[in-house]
């Protein structure tokens, strides 16, 4: 999901909404007369009754007809009032005090009001206006790097999951449910984990050949016995540790109906290549902390010559960092330029110092031909890796590969290893104390038993009714995008037709995959052994089984309805190579979505996230894929050129934002910024469509904002968040999202309807005269 922001408001400019409640005066006698009922005419008719005997028959008939017509008008007026002035579906209805709808409206009003800072002008700094109250009242918990409104939803989901795991039974049942509970208990059994100490890892290291080529010096005979490919097989094919490069089974970007082996740059421990280059004070500190971490872990494992090993391993990673292309680079955003499909025979010529057929045969348990095709996403990188292998001593390469396995698994060891990891995280991100054990174990259960845990979650915390309502909300927002495509003046007819087709074919997954309702189907996802006293072995069993499932895909038919994340995930995503949007049950929770909240808040909350993911299909990344999820340029050159010019405006806008003296990278964050802006507009216009169809909503109690204003406030309050200063450095360096503050400011300031809703003067910070717009 996403990140933080600020704003300002003159409250005397806000328009209060007046409404007549059917729960008000006269309610005890039944529904009160709706506004517009001709009371005066009724009294006149009644008062004239004494003169009736003197009227002739024609006059009486005429009067009767008028009375009948008046009655019809009254009935029609009542029906219209029920539709437009009475309670709407969002829940403001004719109900007694204390009914669920009223409670939900009151709860929503309290949440919004507590988060606001009414002293700030929304036309100056909307983020600070919308989130100032929240920022004042909340601190970052000691064991967290960030904390925000969405994180609070995560805490609620975590507590629910913990309670489900603590139960001896319950839920849909099945072997997978028993296994995830046993796994969770094994993770909590710190006494047993401490008793074992480093032994589980020492067994893994021995399986990889030990340190220093089994403890021998590099000399004739020993070097000849060493085989890089065998160790790569252990690292990648047994322990799932990316070393030198990554090997994955993925959809073929140019033919998404089949799976393909994909090879890409990888093998660094730190999250960004520039951290190895020590180009500023922050990266120097992080690199020094990483070196200390390496030495400490090596010492805990009883290795010899710890300082020398750490230095040599670090030098290998620094060499890899120097040949790695930054994710900020244009090359890494242009999939077509990266994509290089080659045969195994061709791959062998590109990187002659690796035995590819042998390596892939071992991992996939296949007998590949030299004509088997793989996709190489980093051709230049792999050529340089081959040179690095040739020029690096075997002993050093061996220790690097073993280290990559150690790093992947060290978080599952005894407290001294976990303390070393925490100290590194403390220097990198500023966390004050380690996460409590129960949270750590819940995270591991999510990672290794995601769907089993998800089956428990949706069984109790997400209904079929909620799923249907969100699906309708998605369809409303898709409809608006369809309309928007017809209105864009920069898109020609040919490109517009392809864009419409992509929208029509887009798959939408909401809540959970249907197979979770079938215990037998869930069990098949976890056919490996789990025991309460063998946590580390449980981890290894899970990793090996996951590798087995992955390698089997290479000959399987593609099922594009599969989910990348489990339903309890607090996230949403769009996959361009499937043309698929997914909104898990974990994010469809209050306060992002509540079926009893006003629709202004639902459209401003989850609606803007739905619009965000939908827009990803047409940003600088997703726009490279067609309606079937294939990497295909479906734009005309004229339309694409105009798209790039409009996108450049957004790049310049975000390039001008700074956080802690770090400049936001407008190009690196472009796709997310396009999605934020587009999502806000789509959700807003979808809400206007909803109002036209259902009538205006009742105002929230004790809040004087219109529902258009509440829509924008809800959007901003999605991103109320605090970050530790150290984590902001890494966020700007590595995150494709702009800091949350600017996600809000950048989006609302470029949307004409925001300025109109808050009556912002032209050229005020939130309503500049010149605006950027793509979708």
Curated annotation (Swiss-Prot):
PROSITE patterns with a match to the protein in the record: NEPRILYSIN (PS51885), ZINC_PROTEASE (PS00142)
UniProt-annotated binding residues for Zn(2+): 612, 616, 672
Keyword Metal-binding among UniProt keywords: yes
Listed GO MF terms: metal ion binding; metalloendopeptidase activity; metallopeptidase activity
Lumenal side: 83-775
Cross-referenced Pfam families: Peptidase_M13 (PF01431), Peptidase_M13_N (PF05649)
UniProt xrefs under Gene3D superfamilies: Collagenase (Catalytic Domain) (3.40.390.10), Neutral endopeptidase , domain2 (1.10.1380.10)
Disulfide bond residue pairs: 123-760, 131-720, 187-441, 649-772
Cytoplasmic topological segments: 1-59
Cofactor: Zn(2+)
Keywords: Disease variant, Disulfide bond, Glycoprotein, Hydrolase, Membrane, Metal-binding, Metalloprotease, Protease, Signal-anchor, Transmembrane, Transmembrane helix, Zinc
Membrane topology listed for this record: Single-pass type II membrane protein
Annotated cofactor note: Binds 1 zinc ion.
GO biological process: neuropeptide signaling pathway; protein processing; respiratory system process
Recorded consequence of changing residue 607 to S: In DA5D; patients have ophthalmoplegia
Ranges of residues in domain Peptidase M13: 98-775
Free-text function comment from the UniProt entry: May contribute to the degradation of peptide hormones and be involved in the inactivation of neuronal peptides.
Disease: Arthrogryposis, distal, 5D: An autosomal recessive form of distal arthrogryposis, a disease characterized by congenital joint contractures that mainly involve two or more distal parts of the limbs, in the absence of a primary neurological or muscle disease. DA5D is characterized by severe camptodactyly of the hands, mild camptodactyly of the toes, clubfoot and/or a calcaneovalgus deformity, extension contractures of the knee, unilateral ptosis or ptosis that is more severe on one side, a round-shaped face, arched eyebrows, a bulbous upturned nose, and micrognathia.
Name the record gives this protein: Endothelin-converting enzyme-like 1
């Amino acid at each position: 999901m996403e990140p933080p922001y600020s704003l300002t408001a003159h409250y005397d400019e806000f328009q209060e909404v007046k409404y007549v409640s059917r729960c008000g005066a006269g309610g005890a006698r039944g529904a009160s007369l709706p506004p517009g009922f001709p009371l005066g005419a009724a009294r006149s008719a009644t008062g004239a009754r004494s003169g009736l005997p003197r009227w002739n028959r024609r006059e009486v008939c005429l009067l009767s007809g008028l009375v009948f017509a008046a009655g019809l008008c009254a009935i029609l007026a009542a029906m219209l009032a029920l539709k437009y002035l009475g309670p709407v579906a969002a829940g403001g209805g004719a109900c007694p005090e204390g009914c669920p709808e009223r409670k939900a409206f009151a709860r929503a009003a309290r949440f919004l009001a507590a988060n606001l800072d009414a002293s700030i002008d929304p036309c100056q700094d909307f983020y600070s206006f919308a989130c100032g109250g929240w920022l004042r009242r909340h601190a970052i918990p000691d064991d967290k790097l960030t904390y925000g409104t969405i994180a609070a939803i995560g805490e609620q989901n975590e507590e629910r999951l913990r309670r489900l795991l603590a139960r001896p039974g319950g839920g849909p049942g099945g072997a997978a449910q028993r296994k995830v509970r046993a796994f969770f208990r094994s993770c909590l059994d710190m006494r047993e984990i401490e008793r074992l100490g480093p032994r589980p890892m020492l067994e893994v290291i021995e399986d990889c050949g030990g340190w220093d080529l089994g403890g021998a010096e590099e000399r004739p005979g020993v070097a000849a016995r060493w085989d890089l490919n065998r160790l790569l097989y252990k690292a990648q094919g047994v322990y799932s540790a990316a070393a030198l490069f990554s090997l994955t089974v993925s959809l073929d970007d140019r033919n998404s109906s089949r799976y393909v082996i994909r090879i890409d740059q990888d093998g660094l421990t730190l999250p960004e290549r520039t951290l190895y280059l020590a180009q500023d004070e922050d990266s120097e500190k992080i690199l020094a902390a990483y070196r200390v971490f390496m030495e400490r872990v090596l010492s805990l494992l009883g290795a010899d010559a710890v300082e020398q090993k750490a230095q040599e391993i670090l030098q290998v990673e620094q060499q890899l960092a120097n040949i790695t292309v930054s994710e900020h680079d244009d090359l890494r955003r242009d999939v077509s330029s990266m994509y290089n499909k080659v045969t195994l025979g061709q791959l062998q010529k590109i990187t002659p110092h690796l035995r590819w057929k042998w390596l892939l045969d071992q991992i996939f348990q296949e007998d590949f031909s030299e004509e088997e095709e793989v996709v190489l996403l980093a051709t230049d990188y792999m050529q340089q890796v081959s040179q690095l292998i040739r020029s690096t001593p075997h002993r050093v390469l061996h220790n690097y590969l073993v280290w990559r396995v150690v790093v992947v698994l060290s978080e599952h060891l005894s407290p001294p290893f976990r303390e070393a990891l925490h100290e590194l995280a403390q220097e990198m991100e500023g966390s004050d104390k380690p996460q409590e054990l129960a949270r750590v174990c819940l995270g591991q259960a999510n990672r290794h038993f995601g769907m089993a845990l998800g089956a428990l979650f949706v069984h109790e915390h997400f209904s079929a009714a909620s799923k249907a309502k969100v699906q309708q909300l998605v369809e409303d927002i898709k409809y608006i995008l369809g309309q928007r495509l017809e209105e864009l003046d920069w898109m020609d007819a040919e490109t517009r037709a392809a864009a419409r087709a992509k929208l029509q074919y887009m798959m939408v997954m909401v809540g959970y995959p249907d197979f979770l309702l079938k215990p037998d189907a869930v069990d098949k996802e976890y056919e490996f052994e789990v025991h309460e006293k063998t946590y580390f072995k449980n981890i290894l069993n899970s990793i090996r089984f996951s590798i087995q499932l992955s390698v089997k895909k290479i000959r399987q038919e593609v099922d594009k309805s599969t989910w990348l994340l489990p339903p309890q995930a607090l996230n949403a995503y769009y996959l361009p190579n499937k043309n698929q949007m997914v909104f898990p049950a974990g994010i469809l929770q209050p306060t992002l979505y509540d079926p009893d909240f006003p629709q202004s808040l639902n459209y401003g909350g989850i609606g803007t996230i739905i619009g965000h993911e939908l827009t990803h299909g047409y940003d600088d990344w997703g726009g490279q894929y067609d309606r079937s999820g294939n990497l295909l340029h479906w734009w005309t050159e004229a339309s694409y050129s105009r798209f790039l010019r409009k996108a450049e405006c957004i790049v310049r806008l975000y390039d001008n934002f700074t956080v802690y003296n770090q400049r936001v990278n407008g190009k690196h964050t472009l796709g997310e910024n396009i999605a934020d802006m587009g999502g806000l507009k789509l959700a807003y216009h979808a809400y206007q469509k909803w109002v036209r169809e259902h009538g205006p909503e009742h105002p929230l109690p004790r809040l004087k904002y219109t529902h258009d204003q509440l829509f924008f406030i809800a959007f901003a309050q999605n991103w109320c968040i605090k970050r530790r200063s150290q984590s902001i450095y890494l966020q700007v360096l590595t995150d494709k999202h702009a800091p949350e503050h600017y996600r809000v400011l950048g989006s609302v300031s470029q949307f004409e309807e925001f300025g109109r809703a808050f009556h912002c003067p032209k050229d005020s910070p939130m309503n500049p005269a010149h605006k950027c717009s793509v979708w």
